[in-house]
Amino acid sequence: MNTTSQQYDAIISICRELYSKKMKDYGCAWRILRLPSLTDQIFIKAQRIRSLQENEVRKVDEDEASEFIGIINYCIMALIQIDKGIADQPDLNFEEGIRLYDEKVALTKALMENKNHDYGEAWREMRVSSLTDLILQKLLRVKQIEDNKGKTLVSEGIDANYQDMINYSVFAMILMGKDNE
């Protein structure tokens, strides 16, 4: 049986491959997006997942997994934006874009491992729909923090919320068996 760390890496490998291909196709055009724009893109993906979970009929041939991949990659882009700021023009070459991606993944995986140790892998007993709801809750929190110009009184910042959404998405994909594909 794979360890959580190995399963995590397998999911991230799928996401990184798509990110890499899109970087080759489009460059880093996403660097012009402000954080609320990225948050809205993530929200659209999460709402779509919830809709797929609730509806039997699908009119677009995409599944939950592709939307979770989108959430992961958009959250990583948001973490990069937090550190680098918004660019007026695309300003990252392919290698730098991949390096920053890997850096954000490493930090987020370390957070997961620390929380996983403390919570005893409780996520393994959760439903994918519950993880989707937690992602939507995090998005509502992020939107509120953005509306408050990034200020919080007692809560964690936007970056921690993006990291949690990445980890919840990875967990959902593991529960769906996508780490074995």
Region annotations inferred by a language model:
Residues M1-E181:
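Intrinsically disordered, low-complexity regulatory regions
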